[in-house]
């Protein structure tokens, strides 16, 4: 039995792929053998044949666990992050997806790296979220939160959006485009990157605004202070207009409504092994070329 600074650990996974399920099983028995109390999220528990296991939802894990381990791809992490960010819990991910910017542990070496993490050797990163509210009938209604991005878009590919952007009550521009991405630094390697936005280091205290196919050459991505409050207004709505956040169901927006996006009071307490380096991760995940010294070896 090995000592651990984490007494209770949650296991979270949504994939039914045999390799992912195998990781759930190996991880559960490994943690259990160390005398750690393990809470398995319902989806993962339904795929395991574990007798007398403690099973709960994301809020149960957030309330009672010290650490949550998410197994899967970045989508699985996003799915869990919005709930876990509302609790005082650290989160780490084992990659069973594709890129794995958020779930960065290699499943083949995860137990070795987790041994160091359980001993207290890890890097801590606090990733902020964005809160989305809509002003509807003179009332502010909270829609949800996003760890990656908030996306304004239409329901059909042929229609453009006309909207006005305000930052801290100051008019910035009006635009006709296919939409707008409002991204955190965490989300700058996701949809915002595909739309031509820059990559922001996760510790940068900023919000990224990236137009989607704007109908003007002068419209460029903009980086603003994370303390700014963003407002979207719509002078004309000719098709179904929606606001989406991460992988959650988009919400329909009407002409008379205004959308507000600001930095959330909650954050995702993400941890990494001590050998983690963000730019090395970018190099590997995005296929950047090697440096000159390495190519001469």
From Swiss-Prot:
Its main location: cytoplasm. It is found in: Cytoplasm. This is NAD kinase. Its cofactor is a divalent metal cation. The active site is at 74 (proton acceptor). It catalyses: NAD(+) + ATP = ADP + NADP(+) + H(+). One of its GO terms (cellular component) is cytoplasm. Pfam families: NAD_kinase, NAD_kinase_C. GO terms for biological process: NAD metabolic process; NADP biosynthetic process.
């Amino acid at each position: 039995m090995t000592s651990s600074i984490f007494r209770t650990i949650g296991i979270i996974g949504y994939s039914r792929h045999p390799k992912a399920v195998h990781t759930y099983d190996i991880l559960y028995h490994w943690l259990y053998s160390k005398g750690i109390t393990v809470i398995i999220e319902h989806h993962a528990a339904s795929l395991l044949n574990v007798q007398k296991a403690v099973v709960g939802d994301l809020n149960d894990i957030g309330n009672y666990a010290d650490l949550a381990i998410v197994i899967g791809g970045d989508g699985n992490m996003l799915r869990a992050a919005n709930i876990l960010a509302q609790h005082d819990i650290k989160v780490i991910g084992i990659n069973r997806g594709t890129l794995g910017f958020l779930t960065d542990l290699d499943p083949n070496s995860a137990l070795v790296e987790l041994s160091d993490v359980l001993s207290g050797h890890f890097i801590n990163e606090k990733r902020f979220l964005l809160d989305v509210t809509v002003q509807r009938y003179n009332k502010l209604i909270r829609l949800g939160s996003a760890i990656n991005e908030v996306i304004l878009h239409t329901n059909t590919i042929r229609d453009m959006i006309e909207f006005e952007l305000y930052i801290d009550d100051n008019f910035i521009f009006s635009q006709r485009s296919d939409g707008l991405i409002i991204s955190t630094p965490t989300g700058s390697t996701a949809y915002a990157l595909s739309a031509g936005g820059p990559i922001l280091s996760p510790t940068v205290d900023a919000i990224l605004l990236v137009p989607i196919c704007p109908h003007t050459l002068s419209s460029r991505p903009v980086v603003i202070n994370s303390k700014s409050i963003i407002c979207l207004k719509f002078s004309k709505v000719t098709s179904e207009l929606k606001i989406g956040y991460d992988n959650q169901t988009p919400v329909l927006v009407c002409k008379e409504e205004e959308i507000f996006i600001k930095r959330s009071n909650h954050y995702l307490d993400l941890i990494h092994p001590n050998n983690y380096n963000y730019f090395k991760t970018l190099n590997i995940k995005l296929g950047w070329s090697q440096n000159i010294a390495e190519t001469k070896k």
